[in-house]
């Protein structure tokens, strides 16, 4: 990277938010107080951060001892120039499990987000991206440079006492990133750029965009974070390639996790033994593919579309996942039992939202969405009712 370090603003309450901020701070060209600004929820949280000596602390997952810390700049309001005007945010990384929180915070910083702003949504739900595209940045001329990034694994650690991070992962994290330069249109009207022109533009952006340069530098870091050896392997994709990958993952998860919860399964393999479950899975797949086809007709122009989103292929992937990962716990069912928030709105809720928006059939996904929300409600009611204690 050049000697001019781009300032990066970091927004969100996830372990990945802190981990990525720490890695950016470790770049050799960073000053003692790194050019990273944490955007905290409100003034109260900012005060608590300042009372914590403005530090993010990394603790060992084995003995809870501090292994590393770093001081950061922080704020809870849009940046202000010396003349009192709101300053632009050039680079923003957003990572939080709550889509509602993200949309509310983006509204808060709206005047700082310009067409030249780079915004990376890290491990976002497709529901969030669709909402932002449909309601917030519908027109190209007003839209910032949007990126989406997905990591494997997604769950890298746990946050304790707001500013303490315990890392679960050691080793290499796969980091997949793409510029959202062609979010699928809701109609087949309008011409998209030719593949050759799009390819040339993507190549130029990969070489010159500040985010790509930044993450290439991060992927070259070999130092650990305290005693934890954590590094990123960077993979840069075209938008549709990464979108297809995440859409496929979403279909697989939304066809199994809600059913596992409805049937009170503990392990994924149990779904294979339940009579009629496979028929429901087939109906869900068929409905979801129909919703995608109706909602995003422009995707049909991709030569891989009909192969990737073939009904039989998707069903085979679902069955294989239940067999190969059958020993793993049902995540959504576990969240329900632990009285935690579920991601049902990001799963079947995505297809229900699309289906209702495009006025096409979404009854199977809507039924599952209703069942899980009802189960979540009654589970919490029972936990609060002394008759069940």
From Swiss-Prot:
Provide the alphabetized UniProt keywords. Activator, Mitochondrion, Translation regulation
Q: GO CC annotations?
A: cytoplasm; mitochondrial ribosome; mitochondrion
Keyword Endoplasmic reticulum (UniProt): no
Example GO molecular function: NADP binding
Predominantly, its location class is mitochondrion
Which Pfam families is this protein grouped with?
Answer: ApbA_C
Q: Where in the cell is it found?
A: Mitochondrion
Q: Which N-terminal stretch is annotated as signal sequence? A: none
Gene Ontology terms describing biological process: positive regulation of mitochondrial translation
Q: So what does this one do? A: Translational activator of cytochrome b. The cytochrome b (coB) leader RNA may represent the target sequence for CBS1 and/ or CBS2.
What other facts are recorded? Answer: Present with 2140 molecules/cell in log phase SD medium.
- Protein name according to UniProt: Cytochrome B translational activator CBS2
